[in-house]
Curated annotation (Swiss-Prot):
Region annotation Disordered: where it falls in the sequence: 399-437, 572-593
Protein name: Proto-oncogene c-Rel
Coiled-coil residue windows: none
Compartment(s) where it occurs, according to its Swiss-Prot or TrEMBL record: Nucleus
Disease: Immunodeficiency 92: An autosomal recessive disorder characterized by recurrent bacterial, viral, fungal, or parasitic infections appearing in infancy or early childhood. Patient lymphocytes show defects in both T- and B-cell proliferation, cytokine secretion, and overall function, and there is also evidence of dysfunction of NK, certain antigen-presenting cells, and myeloid subsets.
Low complexity bias locations: 399-420
Keywords recorded for this protein, A-Z: Acetylation, Activator, DNA-binding, Nucleus, Phosphoprotein, Proto-oncogene, Transcription, Transcription regulation
Biased composition (Polar residues): 421-437
GO BP of this protein: canonical NF-kappaB signal transduction; inflammatory response; innate immune response; negative regulation of gene expression; negative regulation of interferon-beta production; non-canonical NF-kappaB signal transduction; positive regulation of canonical NF-kappaB signal transduction; positive regulation of transcription by RNA polymerase II
Amino acid sequence: MASGAYNPYIEIIEQPRQRGMRFRYKCEGRSAGSIPGEHSTDNNRTYPSIQIMNYYGKGKVRITLVTKNDPYKPHPHDLVGKDCRDGYYEAEFGQERRPLFFQNLGIRCVKKKEVKEAIITRIKAGINPFNVPEKQLNDIEDCDLNVVRLCFQVFLPDEHGNLTTALPPVVSNPIYDNRAPNTAELRICRVNKNCGSVRGGDEIFLLCDKVQKDDIEVRFVLNDWEAKGIFSQADVHRQVAIVFKTPPYCKAITEPVTVKMQLRRPSDQEVSESMDFRYLPDEKDTYGNKAKKQKTTLLFQKLCQDHVETGFRHVDQDGLELLTSGDPPTLASQSAGITVNFPERPRPGLLGSIGEGRYFKKEPNLFSHDAVVREMPTGVSSQAESYYPSPGPISSGLSHHASMAPLPSSSWSSVAHPTPRSGNTNPLSSFSTRTLPSNSQGIPPFLRIPVGNDLNASNACIYNNADDIVGMEASSMPSADLYGISDPNMLSNCSVNMMTTSSDSMGETDNPRLLSMNLENPSCNSVLDPRDLRQLHQMSSSSMSAGANSNTTVFVSQSDAFEGSDFSCADNSMINESGPSNSTNPNSHGFVQDSQYSGIGSMQNEQLSDSFPYEFFQV
């Protein structure tokens, strides 16, 4: 019996969870599960529970399903589980059970065509907790099949001990079927980005559980501020994806601000769990300082790149202006007439150092390839292979000078003249042997070497070289005067071999740098006097330019041929084997090197003669 001064009543201690549970059909053949409590978690599961207040004793409890809206009518869905029959739960409890827990209750839904039959069954069983008129019970049009409520009824014993005294029924919160989009739990599964500009307008792709496109919105909330994402019904894809644009924030910010983003259903004001969204400050550069910095940086990099790669300093229409030190320019820059500035690089030298920088003006060849008569001495035909390329046309800017004094032979042994282009890898006799007509004009005077018939001595050993190309005229003298020896016969059967070092660049051709001079016959060394060496360089240019015979002249067009070359002076036996001399024959044999010449600074004879020991023979 009831105890206390107050009437007993029912109080729900634990409400059922409203969302997250799926209603099962009978045909699915599986249990409908258990209705969890409102505060249930994975680690601490709870279930709906009630407590009878102001009463201690035994009784009976009945649980049925009713509709969502008032008046609460019996619902066609069934309640299934332990102690359930005909779609409702009923069980007695004793005095020791307080409170009452219901952990084996499930909801099984019926098909739409079975709704009316299920309602009639409830009426026959007397399941009408709120005594709704039968006429209203038969009206099933307003019945929502996706939402139910639990109705708790308690019966206490009467005077005769029968459990007939009913306490006022109590209904729980609505329970929604998780399959229905209009009642399902709202949940944000994933977004493609969780930050955006404070000005809004960022496009976001949001994945979610099933929603209704006409009953859903995206809400941004922070304290008292609220805004909605911008999208239309066409932006809801198959009820599981929403594409929207973020709304602008309420004010300008200087630091990121985090707000809450959530889904909300307007029909029942249901909201999802919130997700953080961060508004970023506007990074717009009002004065364009960032663009200016980028432009300045790019311009500076371009200037540095142009200076390093090209090094262009000045363009001269007359030719190529180039520092003597450094690597030579490319072929493309030479042909375009472009001036290239290379950094100065010191070079060691035996006879002096190169100045701060000199300018070389590129000039064409003196002689054309057609002007050279292709005839070779019979004795050296195997040694005179073509080596240098054919020269191009050249202006006749050099004056014609008289021929030198006649020399004893018209044929000379082949002498190798390696240049920087040849890499100094050719043998001693790997140069071309060519002749030039006697009436050739514009031959450099310092390169003329006459060949005559009046010097036919068999013991004559002839050698000629230039030690100051710019400051002197053509050099020619008899063999006796050439060597500064009173008796020319002392040089008979004396083979002379002179070696020079090759120059590294075109700009250093004025440094002969003679290394050795070997007179193979010991008798030659015995008659040479150091004073004779100095006498050789003190000869006047007027005496060296004597001679009027315009015989065929053997020449070398480039002064650097004397540098980096191996000179060999043949004795009388080799000179005689080359054939008879003919001073009037325009096809007289000689050797020639086809190239271009460069203007070269002069070198004092005093420095040249004093730079070597007395046993070296300088010419």
